[in-house]
């Protein structure tokens, strides 16, 4: 990709000083991106310039975007990529959460509601609101699929074999939602209370829905999922919030 820097600069009417600035910025850009452009690498570049002054950041973004468009025009790139200055870059935490042993989450318990809530988060990476919105009609246990409909769109998620018995048990007598009373979904506080009671009963007091979801993220990353793949699974608009898990 570096070999296209000079033809790109030559295609623009630039002063000598501007040419030097373009050349410097693009050499840095190509050094980080390499020969293959993808969203993950662009996010890394976004991070690398995050602490620059606003004017310097805008200059580098503008230069990189012009170069990306040029590469797309000459068909070096099959897709058009664009960096934006509105992307929020997450700071890397010094200590990432560790993967916990979740075997105890699957053992028999009297707190079956809280158990199923926690398993749906652990197994599928759902948020509490997504768990609350699971409709009976969108659960296909024969084909082991959940169709999740939210304001962000529709996602089809595979259900693991180990999750099926827990779902079968709680589907009995349900009219509209997996978690309901006479067809009306339970409140947000209801979910919070049942989850809190269950995790406390198995010795994980303080383990929140957010931390359970983080366990899903860590396991999927360990399984080899890319940041883009994981972002799609979670239904995120952007993978930016996942960056901290992909930094070494």
From Swiss-Prot:
One of its GO terms (molecular function) is tyrosine-based site-specific recombinase activity. GO terms for cellular component: cytoplasm. It is found in: Cytoplasm. It holds the Pfam family Phage_integrase. Belongs to the 'phage' integrase family. XerD-like subfamily. SUPFAM superfamilies: DNA breaking-rejoining enzymes. GO terms for biological process: DNA transposition. Residues 85-248 form the Tyr recombinase domain. It comes from Streptococcus pyogenes serotype M28 (strain MGAS6180). The lineage of its organism: Bacteria, Bacillati, Bacillota, Bacilli, Lactobacillales. Putative tyrosine recombinase. Not involved in the cutting and rejoining of the recombining DNA molecules on dif(SL) site. This is Tyrosine recombinase XerD-like.
